[in-house]
């Protein structure tokens, strides 16, 4: 008997200029415990004057967890927080009753080729934290 219940094969998803390997949600599993989305980003290489441009968008009732192996992402949100996420650092954004945020390659990194490699997961919050 195996301890593995379901093997989920990821699929490529375009996020506007770069692709992620998305494992969740999937046909056989929409969630695993509190995990709603699970994306592997890259490794991706961007030419000069290009990069990640995830425009402002809303979230509600969840937390996003971003961890980079390589590259940098500029996180900005509607609560006024700005953070450059670097390799080995974690960005945990709790949406609760609502937040909007963007993720972009920092301006200073766009002058030269850049790389991005990391993971991002969306975690459902308990009802009392929404």
Describe the function of each predicted region.
Residues 97-101:
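Short, charged beta-turn/beta-strand-edge "cap" motif at the junction between a beta-strand
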Residues 65-87, 102:
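A short beta-strand-loop-beta hairpin characteristic of the jelly-roll/cupin
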Residues 1-10:
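Short, Gly/Pro- and small/polar-rich lid/capping loops
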Residues 13-69, 118:
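A short glycine-rich, His/Asp/Glu-containing loop-to-beta-strand
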Residues 104-115:
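Short, compositionally biased
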């Amino acid at each position: 008997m195996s301890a593995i219940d379901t093997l989920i094969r990821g699929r490529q998803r375009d996020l506007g200029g770069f692709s992620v390997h998305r494992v969740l949600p999937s046909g056989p599993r929409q969630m695993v415990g509190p995990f709603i989305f699970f994306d592997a980003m890259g490794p991706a290489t961007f030419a000069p004057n290009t990069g990640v441009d995830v425009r402002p968008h809303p979230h509600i009732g969840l937390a996003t967890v971003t961890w980079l192996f390589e590259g940098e992402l500029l996180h900005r949100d509607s609560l006024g927080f700005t953070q450059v996420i670097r390799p080995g650092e974690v960005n945990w954004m709790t949406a609760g009753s609502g937040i909007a945020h963007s993720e972009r390659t920092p301006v200073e990194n766009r002058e030269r080729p850049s790389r991005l490699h990391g993971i991002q997961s969306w975690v459902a919050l308990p009802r009392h934290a929404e």
